[in-house]
Amino acid sequence: MFAFTDHKAFSLLFLLFFSLTATAENTSFTTTHFSGSGNCSDCHDGITDDLGEDVSIVQDWSASMKANAAKDPYWKAKIAAELKRNAHLAEVINDKCTECHAPMANYESDGKAEILGDKGVLDPSHPLHDAAMNGVSCTYCHQIEDDASLGTLDGFSGNVEISDGKVAFGQY
């Protein structure tokens, strides 16, 4: 059971990270393997159906858990608590959590992306910050290789293969 000081510290961490969610990122970034959602929105935003209703994938995605995976204040607070409680597992926690919450930053760093702190991808000065904050973005999903694990339990938790060809596959 938590002592009052632990609850107080957790609450302060939660509020701190909640206040950082407004950090603006550059959604038009490019990395070795990925491109930010801002580059996709030029063509895939503002699409309407015959009735004039917006059917843009960009609008749906931008409000989704995928788009906000690295911005979620609860997730940030949970990571901070887990890293504090299990400092000896920091490398494993960082890798496992960024596989799903900041997959482009995880992939570009070969699974070595730190989440918090001076060297963390959530720090706006980090070179992979924009990729991390873009969450599970367009070019991440659209470069997933179609292999036997896709759509099975073996393919869950970020256990996917990414195409190095930078070809964006559709429909998924």
Give the role of each language-model region:
Residues 12-14, 56:
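N-terminal hydrophobic alpha-helix used for membrane targeting or insertion
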Residues 8-9, 17, 65:
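Intrinsically disordered, low-complexity segments
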Residues 15-24:
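Hydrophobic h-region of N-terminal signal peptides that target proteins for export
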Residues 24-134, 146-172:
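Sequence context of c-type cytochrome heme-c attachment sites
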Residues 135-142:
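Subunit-assembly interface segments of extracellular/virion macromolecular structures
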Residues 2-11:
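Bacterial N-terminal signal peptides that target proteins for export
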